[in-house]
């Protein structure tokens, strides 16, 4: 028994490094992390069911890591776990690549955040009370950014996050712009903003309208959101090149 080596169900080699009575053992995983699972059952070692927190079990990219944060509380996933799993799913879940076509194979999660412990620590350091749920945003500080990381991301209220939703369309035009024979119609928040002879003119009107709304809502939330979030909202520039639907002719 002592010194016995076997693979767990995820294919990671593990070795028995201590044994006690009644099949009570300690197991070391033989990967780069060398995590030691203490007081495992020998039967679980034999059937490969001992879990290594460094196995990439979340869409073959993310792993729980070793630390104080659990993905579960009171029989359900924690808020930080759901958000963490969600960003990995957007970027790497092949089965839902059509659902997340503006993220899959385009955006990435930084190596640091593939470890849930690191993301959970960041989340708990930055969360705050506000009206509505908190969402993670990677574009407000750095428009067009494609990396989820502690440097690039902010936690923002859901209402603010929805302002930056970039819904996919098949027109090859940025959101808020409709092509007409005479030119282009600008629309925002259900309102027609007029027709213009060029795309650039129409988008300028659209971007000004959107910027006004962003500033208005930022001021509504000023006393709820961190200064970093408020400043990022005021500094945000609505640019045509950051619209994922826009195809340069």
Predicted regions and their residues:
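Extended, polar beta-sheet/loop recognition surfaces of beta-rich domains
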Residues: 41-59, 64, 160, 168, ...
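Secondary-structure transition/turn motif
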Residues: 28-33, 158, 187-191
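Class I S-adenosyl-L-methionine
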Residues: 87, 205-208, 212, 219-220
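GIY-YIG-like beta-to-alpha core
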Residues: 28-45, 79-89, 195-201
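A short, exposed loop/beta-hairpin motif centered on an aromatic-Gly-Thr core
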Residues: 105-110, 190-200
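Short, cationic Gly/His-enriched loop motifs
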Residues: 68-93, 98-183
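Short helix-coil boundary/hinge micro-motifs
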Residues: 1-36, 51-84, 106-109
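An aromatic-rich alpha-helical recognition segment common to small helix-rich domains
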Residues: 27, 119, 177, 186, ...
């Amino acid at each position: 028994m002592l010194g016995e080596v076997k693979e767990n169900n995820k294919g990671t080699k593990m070795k028995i490094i201590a044994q006690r009575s009644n099949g009570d053992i300690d197991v070391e995983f033989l990967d780069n992390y060398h995590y030691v699972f203490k007081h495992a059952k020998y039967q679980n070692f034999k059937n490969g069911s001992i879990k290594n927190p460094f196995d990439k079990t979340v869409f073959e990219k993310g792993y729980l890591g070793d630390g104080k944060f659990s993905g579960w509380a009171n029989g359900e996933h924690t808020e930080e776990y759901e958000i963490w799993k969600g960003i990995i799913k957007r970027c790497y879940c092949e089965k839902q690549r059509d659902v997340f076509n503006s993220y899959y194979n385009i955006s990435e999660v930084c190596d640091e955040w593939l470890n849930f412990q690191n993301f959970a620590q960041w989340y708990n350091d930055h969360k705050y009370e506000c009206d509505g749920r908190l969402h993670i945003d990677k574009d407000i500080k750095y428009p067009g950014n494609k990396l989820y990381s502690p440097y690039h991301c902010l936690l923002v209220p859901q209402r603010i996050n929805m302002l930056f939703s970039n819904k996919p369309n098949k027109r090859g035009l940025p959101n808020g712009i409709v092509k007409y024979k005479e030119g282009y119609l600008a629309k925002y928040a259900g309102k027609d903003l007029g027709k213009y002879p060029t795309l650039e003119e129409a988008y300028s009107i659209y971007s000004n309208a959107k910027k006004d709304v962003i500033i208005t809502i930022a001021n509504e939330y000023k006393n709820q959101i961190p200064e970093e979030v408020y400043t990022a909202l005021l500094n945000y520039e609505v640019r045509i090149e950051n619209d994922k639907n826009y195809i340069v002719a």
